[in-house]
Amino acid sequence: MQIIDALNSSRDETVALFGLDDADLARTYGPGKWSVRYVLHHIADAETVLFERIRRVISEGRRVIWAFDQDAWARGLDYSTRPMGLSRDLYLASRAGIIHYAARHYDHSGHLEWVHSETGVRTLRDEFDKVVRHNEDHVKQIRMALDRHTASQT
């Protein structure tokens, strides 16, 4: 199943990044952008939010589900001091649940609709796909941050 392969692949690539040293975690992919540390914490928190949405759609049907303010979470949950191991564990637990439900519901129930408070009507399949896309987009940002440092060293 293609979605399962994509979820596993993006998980494996992301988990390795939680082990970066403090110097690499402090790097950014551009001026004024989040550090790698913040991006990884955000990936973990977003994964928990996406997992909740998936479970709500499967269990409660069509309803409005509210967006979350990523900057408020970064401040309120103090990404600057949060342990990387905590975020890694949150990420892995949420991803395991998402993979489980994707295997059971992506094809069978992917048509189920819900309403995102900012973007409107979406489907369960859309949300599973977003998990992969969101993760991959942020891993690209992390790679850019690490590559910027490597390029500046040469």
What spans do the regions from the language model cover?
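Acidic/histidine-rich alpha-helical segments that form the ligand environment
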Residues: 6-10, 16-20, 74-112
